[in-house]
């Protein structure tokens, strides 16, 4: 059993100055209990906390760290650029370089606007879709999380799912009035809502492959059906690749399921672990943005040169061999987890979206938010803590995705393999 004395002290101190002691709710361990670990350093696939405990990292900062932590090429790029200044509030060459890198990887994207977070990216894409179409209503799917702007928190996943809330206090009826929420993976529901409101709907926004109600991949043809329906009604399709973008393939989910959306949003991997994100799409739609057009969007730190350096270094190091390694590591990890749970007699499923996955307990297929919430989530805290105590750091919520990096090595997999039988038994013995 590892000690958490210093983490507990720091959490108490943080709670006196930061609401809940954390700056993103899932970090508080509310859904699994126990003391959040305060991390002091990371290298490769390993995290070290303030108490000196070391963990094999299966969260990867919620996705961005595909190359592992402190990758030499990324660190060198950040240090080199930071030495010349941290922020200028003026254009820099690296902004265009990163935009071009995205355009080269995702064929439908012809123009890119850089922002600071995934929330900004989706919020701005929604505003642009409304400005382009002159319509007000948007369609989103239950359990899909697109950041914490008011209109998009209606029946969202991620931290809202972890907290068991259908939405969030503070989101007014007026803010959500034009948000139409449908069950995920249900083409008939989309067709019905367009039959009713088609000439009022500006856009449909969907996660390319959801990872915020757990990993729940789209059924075959679902995203293509969204493209067909939106095009038929003059609405835009926004595909949110903040999580999947440049993680599940060189071209993100688009590389696995090439549906030509009007707008895409990106984050996480494209910034190499620093705060940056983007949205992009066709030249026609993106041309409505200020200063070319009337749809306003701006940001003091957008295109920050240090974040651009981290993103460019990450994407340029993520070659075909890196993506093959990510897939192989996910295959190996999923196999180990599945074998351990089967051996312990725990009914489970491990849905995949490329090299992302989640662990659901129970036998009914998970295809949407309702079926995700119907799983035996009460088994997850025991499973989580058994792994954590053995030096493995999984996501502290049953509704989050697990992430691998290229840095996972044989020693890390041996440690995981040693920890899993006990964790599986803990899940088997958990009480509802």
UniProtKB/Swiss-Prot annotation:
| Residues with the N6-(pyridoxal phosphate)lysine modification | 268
Localization terms from the record = Cytoplasm
- EC class (word): isomerase
**Presence of keyword Cytoplasm:** yes
Question: Which cofactors is this protein said to need?
Answer: pyridoxal 5'-phosphate
Q: Which InterPro entries match?
A: 4pyrrol_synth_GluAld_NH2Trfase, Aminotrans_3, Aminotrans_3_PPA_site, PyrdxlP-dep_Trfase, PyrdxlP-dep_Trfase_major, PyrdxlP-dep_Trfase_small
GO MF terms listed in the record are:
glutamate-1-semialdehyde 2,1-aminomutase activity; pyridoxal phosphate binding; transaminase activity
The pathway this protein participates in, as annotated, is: Porphyrin-containing compound metabolism; protoporphyrin-IX biosynthesis; 5-aminolevulinate from L-glutamyl-tRNA(Glu): step 2/2
Is Amino-acid biosynthesis one of the keywords? Answer: no
- This protein's source sits in the domain of life called Bacteria
Gene Ontology cellular component terms for the protein in this record = cytoplasm
A GO biological process of this protein is:
protoporphyrinogen IX biosynthetic process
Q: What EC number(s) does this enzyme carry?
A: 5.4.3.8
Which parts of the chain are coiled coil? Answer: none
Listed A to Z, the keywords are:
Cytoplasm, Isomerase, Porphyrin biosynthesis, Pyridoxal phosphate
Q: Subunit comment for this entry?
A: Homodimer.
Question: Member of which family?
Answer: Belongs to the class-III pyridoxal-phosphate-dependent aminotransferase family. HemL subfamily.
Protein name according to UniProt: Glutamate-1-semialdehyde 2,1-aminomutase
Q: Which organism is it from?
A: Mycolicibacterium gilvum (strain PYR-GCK)
**Gene name as annotated:** hemL
């Amino acid at each position: 059993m590892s000690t958490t004395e210093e983490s507990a002290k720091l959490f108490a101190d943080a709670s006196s100055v930061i609401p809940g002691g954390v700056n993103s709710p899932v970090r508080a361990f509310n859904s699994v209990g126990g003391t959040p670990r305060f991390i002091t350093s990371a290298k490769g696939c390993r995290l070290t906390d303030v108490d000196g405990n070391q963990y094999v990292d299966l969260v990867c900062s919620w996705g961005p760290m595909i190359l592992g932590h402190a990758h030499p090429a990324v660190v060198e790029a950040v240090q080199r650029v930071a030495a010349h200044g941290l922020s200028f509030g003026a254009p820099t060459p690296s902004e265009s370089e990163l935009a071009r890198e995205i355009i080269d990887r995702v064929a439908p994207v012809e123009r890119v606007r850089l922002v600071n977070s995934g929330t900004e990216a989706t919020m701005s894409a929604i505003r642009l879709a409304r400005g382009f179409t002159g319509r007000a209503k948007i369609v989103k799917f239950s359990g899909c999380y697109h950041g914490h702007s008011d209109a998009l928190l209606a029946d969202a996943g991620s931290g809202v799912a972890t907290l068991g809330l259908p939405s969030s206090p503070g989101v007014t009826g007026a803010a959500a009035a034009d948000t139409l929420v449908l069950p995920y993976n249900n083409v008939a529901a989309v067709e019905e809502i367009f039959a009713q409101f088609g000439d009022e709907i500006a856009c449909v926004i969907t996660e390319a492959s959801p990872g915020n109600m757990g990993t729940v991949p789209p059924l075959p043809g679902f995203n293509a059906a969204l493209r067909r329906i939106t095009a038929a009604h003059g609405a835009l399709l926004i595909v949110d690749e903040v999580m999947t973008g440049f993680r599940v393939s060189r071209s993100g989910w688009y590389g696995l399921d090439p549906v030509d959306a009007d707008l895409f949003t990106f984050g996480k991997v494209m910034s190499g672990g620093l705060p940056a994100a983007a949205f992009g799409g066709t030249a026609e739609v993106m041309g409505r943005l200020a200063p070319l057009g009337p749809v306003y969007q701006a940001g003091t730190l957008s295109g920050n040169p240090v974040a651009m350096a981290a993103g460019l270094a990450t994407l340029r190091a993520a070659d075909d061999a890196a993506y093959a390694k990510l897939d192989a590591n996910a295959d190996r990890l999923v196999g180990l987890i599945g074998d351990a749970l089967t051996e312990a007699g725990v009914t489970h499923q491990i849905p995949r979206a490329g090299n992302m996955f989640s662990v659901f307990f129970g036998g009914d297929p998970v295809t949407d938010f309702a079926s995700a919430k119907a799983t035996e989530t009460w088994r997850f805290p025991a499973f989580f803590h058994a792994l954590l105590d053995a030096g493995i750091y999984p996501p502290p919520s049953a509704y989050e995705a697990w992430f691998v990096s290229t840095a996972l090595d044989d020693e890390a997999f041996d440690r995981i393999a040693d920890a899993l039988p006990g964790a599986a038994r803990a899940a088997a013995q958990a009480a509802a």
